[in-house]
Amino acid sequence: MQRYVNFFDKNRRDVHGLLLLDKPTGFSSSFFLNKIKKLFYAKKVGYIGTLDPIATGMLPICFGKATKFASYLLNSDKRYRVLVKLGESTDTFDASGVIIRIADVQCNKEKIEECLKSFLGTSLQIPPMFSSLKYQGLPLYKYARRGVNIPRKSRTIHVYSLYCLNQLNSIIELEIHCSKGTYVRSIVNDIGEYLGCGAHIISLRRLMVGQYIASMMVNIKTIESIFFDKDLNDLEVLDKLDNLLISTETIMCSF
């Protein structure tokens, strides 16, 4: 089913607001940005805070005037739920990479809690090579795939909370509240080093960005169900889609 073909000819719509997309796993943030732009038939859109293909959860997408305030969200704290595999290290620090180390897991609950506490507060973190940070116009992960290591500057991060929700043998579930620019995959890798057994991320879910919480997210299937609803005409579809957006003014509420 194709919509808007006759309703719109050349120009896309002026759409303003914020969509908190619940990004599924398996695809890049850019993939879903382009998809949302087409579904909303919007002129100007942009997302805040890249989520890797393996990651899910809150991907803020700004429309129109909201893009002017994107930096406020980019600089906001984030909260994540992360599933970690102890005893295995990978070159990417997550399950998408190649296993480069296997070790026995010999740590109890007390040792893990001691480890997590050591990451609280302010520290310096070097961004991982497998990241979207750019060097001479190319993201670092492209250099990493070629086996090229690029020197990176450390950056200041702050971990407000980090605790273990569940543990089953070598699998632990963590929740972390951290500042902007924090690479959770690097923290997980460092946890593995601290425990002496290695570790990598199995799954990562972003639960919060700034003042926006998980219950405010919109599933991509919800958006598609509106778009493909045969009982709605084009104007009704656009109206229902626009109702999913959060007002631009809310971005400034906590600043």
Curated annotation (Swiss-Prot):
Ranges that cross the membrane: none
EC number: 5.4.99.25
Binding site for substrate: 80, 183, 204
Catalytic reaction(s) noted: uridine(55) in tRNA = pseudouridine(55) in tRNA
Pfam families according to UniProt: TruB_C_2, TruB_N
Xref: SUPFAM superfamilies: Pseudouridine synthase
Keyword list, A-Z: Isomerase, tRNA processing
Cross-referenced HAMAP family: TruB_bact
Protein name: tRNA pseudouridine synthase B
Lineage start: Bacteria, Pseudomonadati, Pseudomonadota, Gammaproteobacteria, Enterobacterales
